[in-house]
């Protein structure tokens, strides 16, 4: 368990080791979250049947994590962090734009995840009754922050091992949850949930793509960059997709079965996604359930903290990686305290702000993945760190595509987390308005992806072919 001293540098050949299968654990650990059970209810909320929800969850999850897998290829081919490799697309200085947005998203979501773990602990222990809710939240907060800081600061080697244990513990405890609640599933009621039309299914599918895996694309190369360059590309993509997808798919499907069996549970989940799940449990299991809730959320927070530190370096802050992670961890700690104990009305607006940033990040993701797939060779190492090199200081084409994708994407999304975000959705009148059936399906994120994919392919493919000879 050694402190990692590598930062934005290309990993030396002598340090590259391991197999593609090692990617299973960090991605599984980041996605073994009880929130996936609640997502099953959200899928049914689109007005579709259980089987439609099942197919939407499987297809949406796999497609979104395929993008994460393709992004991981960049780390294997060039052995540098994601937001350093992004310089080849946006320019060494121009990359500060998507880099800074990614940094805000990382720090924001790690703060939200720790806050959710803290709040969930308090909610769960309210049912036990013998422990003060505030004390329970303090305990949950300390555990969540400690584990997140431990992994994020010490770095890659520790994360790869820690995520394995988090995955095994959380998966086993979640399996017990399924066993304890399986009698609550009424397959007659589940089968009776009416099917929705094609529009409703597509809306749920889009929700699956955007809500489960898409947000991890800008972290992917951070965890594959230690692999040898001769590692099978198919294996890198396959193990990433398998590790990230298998547990969320199972939990979403089971969550849909629970919600389809009891409409009141669906209503409760809408108000309290984690706390509502405790109503099905015996009291003796609640303490273990609290542990699952914390560990499941911490698995994602660890990856966010580690990647936020690397991204801070990638946008030009001249400090060591572990100091960057400590700095980000301090922001996370203070931010979580503020969200949980001070600002009662700030939590949802803050989430709304992060979701708003998700649209430009989606456009960036499409541009970056397209670039990775277009290139047959590794990125030029020296030019990634030289604004006068072949990648240049600023790629105006890529930045323009990102701006267009963001404008279109924001125009086709709704954000109800705060009144000051109501300006979004200014193009929804084209497809039925803010109250239409497409309004809450995140179709704007898909359009942002399409702009990124098509725009970069049309404007960069010929240049990349010429560049590679």
Residue ranges and their predicted role:
Residues 14-20, 154-167, 218-250, 265-275, ...:
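Hydrophobic, small-residue-rich membrane helices and short re-entrant helix-turn-helix hairpins
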Residues 99, 127-153, 168-179, 206-220, ...:
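Transmembrane alpha-helical segments of multi-pass small-molecule transport proteins
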Residues 32-36, 59-67, 102-113, 169-181, ...:
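Selective recognition of specific alpha-helical transmembrane segments in multi-pass small-molecule
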Residues 168-193, 209-214, 253-261, 362, ...:
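Hydrophobic alpha-helical segments and their helix-loop junctions in multi-pass secondary transporters
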Residues 45-46, 73, 89, 97, ...:
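Membrane-water interface regions at transmembrane-helix termini and the short interhelical loops
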Residues 1-51, 199-207, 225-235, 463-469:
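Membrane-interface "cap" regions at the ends of multi-pass membrane proteins
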Residues 56-89, 99-114, 457-464:
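Juxtamembrane transmembrane-helix boundary signature
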Residues 169, 365-454:
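C-terminal membrane-solvent junction of multi-pass transporters and transport-like membrane proteins
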């Amino acid at each position: 368990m050694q402190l990692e001293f590598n930062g934005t540098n290309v990993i030396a050949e002598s340090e590259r080791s391991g197999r593609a299968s090692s990617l299973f654990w960090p991605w599984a650990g980041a996605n073994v979250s009880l929130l996936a059970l609640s997502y099953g209810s959200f899928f049914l909320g689109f007005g579709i049947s259980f089987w439609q929800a099942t197919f939407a969850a499987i297809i949406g999850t796999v497609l979104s994590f395929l993008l994460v897998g393709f992004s991981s290829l960049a780390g294997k081919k060039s052995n540098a962090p994601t937001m350093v490799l992004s310089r080849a697309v946006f320019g060494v200085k121009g990359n500060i734009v998507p880099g800074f947005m990614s940094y805000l998203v990382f720090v924001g979501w790690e703060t939200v995840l720790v806050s959710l773990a803290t709040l969930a602990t308090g909610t769960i222990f309210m049912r036990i009754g013998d422990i003060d809710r505030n004390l329970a939240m303090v305990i949950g907060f300390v555990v969540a922050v400690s584990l997140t800081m431990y992994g994020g600061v010490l770095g890659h080697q520790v994360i790869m091992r820690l995520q394995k244990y988090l995955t095994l513990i959380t998966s086993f405890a979640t399996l017990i949850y399924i066993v304890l609640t399986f009698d609550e599933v009424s397959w007659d009621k589940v089968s009776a949930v009416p099917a929705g039309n094609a529009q409703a299914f597509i809306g749920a599918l889009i929700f699956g793509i955007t809500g489960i895996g898409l947000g991890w694309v800008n972290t992917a190369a951070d965890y594959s960059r230690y692999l040898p360059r001769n590692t099978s590309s198919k294996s890198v993509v396959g193990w990433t997709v398998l590790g990230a997808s298998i547990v969320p798919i199972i939990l979403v499907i089971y969550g849909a079965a629970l919600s389809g069996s009891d409409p009141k549970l669906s209503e409760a989940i809408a108000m309290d996604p984690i706390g509502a799940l405790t109503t099905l449990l015996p009291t003796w299991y609640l303490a273990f359930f609290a542990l699952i809730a914390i560990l499941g959320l911490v698995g994602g927070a660890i990856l966010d903290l580690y990647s936020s530190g690397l991204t801070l370096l990638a946008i030009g802050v001249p400090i060591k990686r572990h100091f960057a992670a400590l700095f980000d961890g301090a922001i996370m700690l203070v931010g979580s305290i503020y969200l949980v104990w001070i600002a009662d009305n700030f939590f949802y607006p803050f989430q709304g702000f992060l979701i708003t940033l998700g649209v430009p990040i989606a456009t960036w993701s499409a541009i970056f993945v397209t670039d990775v797939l277009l290139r047959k060779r590794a990125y030029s190492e020296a030019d990634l760190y030289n604004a006068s090199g072949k990648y240049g200081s600023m790629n105006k084409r890529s930045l323009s595509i990102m701006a267009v994708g963001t404008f279109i994407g924001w125009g086709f999304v709704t954000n109800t987390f705060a009144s000051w975000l109501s300006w979004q959705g200014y193009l929804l009148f084209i497809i039925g308005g803010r109250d239409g059936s497409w309004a809450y399906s995140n179709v704007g994120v898909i359009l942002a992806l399409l702009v990124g994919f098509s725009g970069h392919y049309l404007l960069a493919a010929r240049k990349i072919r010429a560049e590679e000879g």
